[in-house]
């Protein structure tokens, strides 16, 4: 009698337990984790729309040519996917965001300029007309030096865009 009661009771208990688990379980894709909520992505988009306006003004003055920078899309991407999509020669800069918050450790970002844009900017900075010609080579030391100054100013412009949300001192 006890065996039949305990056998039936354990089946009923297991059935209740699986039903409770089924209600609380959410599917999670470990291969492609989503770390940001839609609200956070909208905030990031707002920040970078402000940033686009700021650097549009900076680049227009620097290059003596009307420049319009726009946010096309915000998406999450793993670093190795980003890295694998880069061409062989690319203009990259790492920026320490200098977040003023004791709860946040050092936070760095990567800024990348597409090669056609980089070569057009270099041409304008050197007095040319900024026409793009397809170039597939590494950057010279002079080109890197010119773009280092530009990238520093672009990094410093991040402060104005991020300040309404968090105090940063990008370097």
Language-model region placement:
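N-terminal auxiliary interaction/assembly segments of multi-subunit proteins
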Residues: 1-171
